[in-house]
A protein has these predicted regions:
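Active-site-adjacent structural segments surrounding the nucleophilic cysteine of cysteine proteases
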Residues: 1-68, 139
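Short, conserved catalytic or adaptor-binding loops enriched in Gly and charged residues
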Residues: 1, 77-81, 164-167
Length: 188
């Protein structure tokens, strides 16, 4: 497994949940899932291992929209700002995503829509939600993602694409490589 930091952030945490995102009319608790997803990827790096969403919010708030959380390009910009080269794909065909995943760092962000996903009909959100994955594997004919979910449903741990996600994945941001000057926790 290549998970370097086990910390899981909740966007409603009292330390940052009441912070404005983007304005005082919209709280981080209700709109900060995109920022938390970027944070979950970035804390895997030595440079940001002790950061919290309050630290990441300072940069990410410029990509927040009133009542709609983080813009899609904000996820790309955030991951790039915090040390990753990123490949973004709309999930119109997962085959393209699987090809990129096989050459990736096993980290990224998934945007879920508002339907129930997979054969087990899992509810990830009722309106759209960003969730980080910090590892993945292919096992028994299915792709599995190790997710860190900042939302109240707390979908943390291993989730199967077929059983838990199929039909509800809208976009995927895949961290393909590290930029110069960045390294994973514990690596030389």
């Amino acid at each position: 497994m290549t998970i370097y930091n086990k910390t899981i952030f909740r966007q409603a945490d009292s330390r940052w949940g009441s912070l404005p995102y983007p304005t005082s009319s919209y709280s981080f608790a209700g709109n900060g899932c995109g920022c938390c997803a970027v944070a979950h990827c970035a804390i895997e790096l030595e440079n940001f291992k002790n950061y919290t969403p309050a630290n990441f919010r300072k940069y990410m708030v410029q990509f927040a929209t009133k009542g709609n959380g983080t813009l899609w390009n904000g996820i790309t910009k955030g991951l790039e700002h915090y040390g990753f080269n990123v490949h973004w794909r709309q999930a119109d065909t997962m085959e393209d995503i699987w090809k990129v995943l096989k050459k990736s760092l096993k980290k990224g962000v998934i945007l879920f829509g508002s339907s129930k996903g997979g054969t087990k009909r899992v509810t990830w959100t009722t309106s759209g939600h960003f969730v980080a994955f910090v590892d993945w594997k292919y096992e028994n004919g299915d792709y599995w993602f190790y997710c860190k979910d900042s939302g109240g449903r707390k979908h943390d741990g291993w989730f199967s694409y077929k059983q838990h996600m199929a039909g509800d994945v809208r976009n995927v941001w895949i961290c393909t490589s590290l930029k110069s000057g960045y390294k994973f926790i514990g690596s030389s």
